[in-house]
Amino acid sequence: VDVTTAAAALDRLEQVYSSRPGTVRALAEQGRRVIGVVGADVPVELVEAAGAVAYRLHGHPDVLSAEAQEVLGASLDPVAHSVLTQVLGGSLTFLDGLVVSRDSQASLQLFYALRELRRLEPHRAIPPLHLLDLLHLPTEPTARYDEVRLGRLADVLGSWTGQPVTAGLTASVAAVAELRHLLREVSDLRRGPRPVLTGTRVLRVLGAAAALPTDVSLPLLRRLVDGAGALPALPQGRRVYLTGSAQDHDEVYVALEAALGCLVVGEDTDWGDLALSADVGGADLGALARAYRDRGPAAATASLPRRAAWTAEQVRRSAAEVLLGVVREHDEAPAWDFPAQRAAVAADGVPSALLARQPYRVLATDLRSALGSATCEPVLSGARA
């Protein structure tokens, strides 16, 4: 798609976000190999080096089947139910393979369920599966362990696509490094004294980039970043930093910004800024292993002190005025983090609020109640979320 302005590039990326399954299906129909990805631990660099599009799967509160809930059990993060609903419903049959990272209990249970269903019910047309189990301890044995796991993943990807990763790894590492750099620049457009993007739009751009090959996403992102100075400044709303469960759809952001008038200036979750925290130092499996081992601390895999320190630093960096935790039911890890996060930001005089055990669809009224006296002035008057 030829776009000539930052606004046009932004519109195109938002269109992709709202139609991700259809967009990726169209790429598959054009002959592109597509690998589904669950979780943030799967290196996009390896998928692209194998000649495929990395499509990070996501859910939505409107896409939940009774069958998926029965298969996985009710006491599991509903994101896994939604992803399984899509697989069982046949809407992801264009995938050439599916890599599930063991970054949460829900992801692990999803993998086991899919593997068993693929074995017992071949008519389901469930794609080939692979489980990626990376560790995040800051030790050399961890790096060596992770390097072996990435080597196995590279072999699996090559067998699925027919293209070994070795020849394309240097180019893919460079492309994904530029992608992360540009996405960090985009994320910064909601911060600073003159924000020009809402957190909602940043979330959508990041989500779109997780569904596009870099040869498609990079030109759009370059245009957006290069022309951002021409975008209109937003009125200043109360600056909210979001923690808790990763938001794989935009309804919480829309409620905070369009309904309550806040501005989401950052988040420590892996559908947002945390997904951009891996810095790969070379075009080899060892460098990838170290980068993904050391990426920003996720709730399910990092220590409480490291999470709290990361959150506090990002709250300071974004000049946030309140820390808001939104934690889904059956996603326990982020709730354990919150007391330490609350104490860390309180040392800087930043108030905090927590919404725990939330349904997959969080209501604006509940967000308003959680914020309490931390009311927001309208940030989106005359502008889209």
Model-derived features: where do they sit?
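Peripheral docking tails and interdomain loops at the edges
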Residues: A6-A7, F338-A385
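Proline-aspartate-enriched helix->loop->beta-strand connector
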Residues: V315, A319-G325
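Redox- and metal-dependent alpha/beta enzyme cores, enriched for Fe-S-associated oxidoreductases
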Residues: G39-G59, Y241-R316
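A charged, amphipathic alpha-helical module
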Residues: D2-R33, E147, G151-S277
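Glycine-rich, highly charged phosphate/nucleotide-binding loops
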Residues: V71-G89, A298-E313
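Acidic/His-rich segments in extracytoplasmic proteins that coordinate ligands and/or metal ions
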Residues: S82-S159
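Metallocofactor- and cofactor-centric catalytic cores in central/energy metabolism, strongly enriched
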Residues: Q15-V24, G36-A40, V44-E45, L64-E67, ...
